[in-house]
């Protein structure tokens, strides 16, 4: 440590932040999967998970009973008992669906949304989003090198990443490709492929009656 302008600078943390930024640029699939596993554990802890004996838990199990692996990736599914109309998938194969989405969509629509989110993983979109979230955390680590400004990254890394991922946006091309994947995902599993367009239309209808800041549009933003 040394001082500039009366403030103590944590040189070790500055070096660690620089290392984090460099590392983020070369994250392997294994690195992302490990990070995703830690992230999903954090999310499962900070959100109420609907158990297998609940209506939503049983419904999700019925929907995904025959979908255990995609493109060599083992999948696991859970539903959060929250009002958000959202869903996401991570590089470790974890797929999470929010209760708010399940309440407004039928089975084919929910299945299509799940396929859409898995598409982001298969196309490495989720990996890129995780990299960007890691970079955001690394930037905060650098900012936190001045003692007393922000909490240490090691104390809030997962929270920072959760915040960054919640605000992540995919490109129009990435969304279109994920829609195509979701469409084919439905066909391959004997579901109505129009569940994809129906789910999108339902979101668009909701957007007309909800404030633009509402979280439900983040899923396809």
Q: What positions do the PLM features span?
A:
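A Zn2+-metalloprotease active-site environment signal
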Residues: 1-221
